[in-house]
A protein has these predicted regions:
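An N-terminally biased module of ancient metal coordination in phosphate/nucleic-acid-related enzymes
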Residues: 1-89, 93-101, 160, 168-180, ...
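N-proximal accessory regions
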Residues: 13-16, 24-27, 31, 91-139, ...
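Conserved, mostly hydrophobic/aromatic
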Residues: 19, 42, 109, 163, ...
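Domain-core and long-helix interface of multi-subunit machines
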Residues: 25, 61, 113-223
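A structural motif
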Residues: 47, 106, 157-158, 225, ...
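Long, positively charged, glycine-interspersed low-complexity recognition regions
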Residues: 218-273
Length: 273
C-alpha cells in the first residue's frame, strides 16, 4: 500500500504538464496570440516543460511553425508538440492518419477513450454524458471501456494514456471486482512500454478524484509503468491546477521520477529542486 512505500520528507516539486488544450473544444488555428498565454502561465506557476495535446479531431488548427516560433520566444521553457488521439467513431480514423503523417514532427501522443455507445456525444461530457449510464449494466460498461483502452494501446500510436479511469467521472462504480480487468490493461501498457498520466482534472469533475484511482496507481508503480503529470487544461489559467495537491499525493506513493518526451523518446527526470 502507499503507506508502506518510502516517503520523502516533503512533497516534491512538479515541473511538467503533459495534457493541455490550447484550442479548447473547437478548431482554432495555432498563432502566437493563442499560444503565448500558455507559455506565460507555465512560467508563472513554475512549470518548465509543457505539451500541447489538442484533440485529434481539431488537428487542422495545429501549426508546427507556430510552435517553433513559440519555442524561440520562450527558450526557458521546453514546449512539446503533441496531440490527444481518442476513439471518436466519426473523426479518429482521420486523426490516426494525420498522426502517422506527422509522426516525426510530434513529440508526444496521448491516448484516450471518450466514446462508448453514442457516436455523437462523449460519455464524459458534464453533465449531459451522465445520461448514457442511466439504466445500464455498469460492470459491462467498465469492461467495454477498458477493452477500448487496450485496443487503443495496441495501435502502437500512443506514448501515454490519459485519465485512465475516466469511466468513473459521473460517480458510477462497478459492482464486480475489476482488479483483473485493470491488471490485464496495465500489463498491456507495460508490454507496450508506454506511460500513464496522473491527472488532476478529476478533482474538478463530479467524481472529485485523481485520475487514476489510488489502487491503479499502486499497480502501475508495481509494474514499473512510467508516469506523467497532467492537468487536462482547457484554458491557460488551468495549467498546473492542483499540482501542489498532486505533489503531496506523489510523495505519499514514494514516486521520485516523472517522464517527459521529445520526439516520442521518453526520459525520466527526478522530482528534485
Amino acid at each position: 500500500m502507499a503507506s508502506e512505500l518510502q516517503r520523502p520528507k516533503t512533497p516534491l516539486p512538479l515541473f511538467s504538464d503533459y495534457h493541455t488544450h490550447p484550442q479548447g473544444h473547437r478548431v482554432q488555428r495555432y498563432t502566437q496570440a493563442l499560444l503565448q498565454p500558455w507559455a506565460d502561465s507555465a512560467r508563472r506557476v513554475g512549470l518548465k516543460d509543457i505539451a500541447f495535446t489538442d484533440h485529434d479531431r481539431y488537428h487542422a488548427g495545429i501549426e508546427f511553425d507556430e510552435i517553433d516560433q513559440l519555442r524561440e520566444r520562450n527558450q526557458d521553457l521546453r514546449i512539446r508538440a503533441g496531440i490527444e488521439l481518442d476513439n471518436d467513431p466519426i473523426h479518429s480514423a482521420a486523426g490516426r492518419k494525420w498522426i502517422e503523417q506527422h509522426w516525426d514532427k510530434l513529440d508526444f501522443v496521448l491516448g484516450s477513450v471518450h466514446f462508448l455507445d453514442r457516436a455523437d456525444q462523449m460519455f464524459d461530457s458534464v453533465p449531459e454524458g451522465a445520461a448514457q449510464f442511466d439504466g445500464r449494466d455498469i460492470d459491462a460498461m467498465y469492461a467495454d471501456y477498458f477493452r477500448r483502452i487496450r485496443e487503443l494501446v495496441e495501435t502502437g500510436l500512443v506514448d501515454c494514456l490519459a485519465h485512465l479511469d475516466l469511466i468513473k467521472i459521473h460517480g458510477h462504480r462497478p459492482n464486480a471486482d475489476i482488479a483483473s480487468l485493470i491488471g490485464e490493461t496495465l500489463e498491456i501498457v507495460r508490454r507496450r512500454n508506454i506511460a500513464i498520466e496522473l491527472s488532476t482534472a478529476g478533482w474538478r469533475k463530479p467524481i472529485n478524484e485523481l485520475y487514476p484511482s489510488d489502487p491503479i496507481i499502486e499497480l502501475a508503480i508495481g509494474k514499473g509503468i512510467p508516469l506523467t503529470t497532467a492537468s487536462d487544461a482547457h484554458s491557460h489559467v488551468q495549467l498546473g491546477e492542483n499540482f501542489a495537491r498532486l505533489a503531496r499525493k506523489i510523495s505519499a506513493f514514494g514516486v521520485r521520477h516523472v517522464c517527459i518526451f521529445q520526439k516520442h523518446k521518453r526520459a525520466e527526470l527526478p522530482l528534485q529542486v
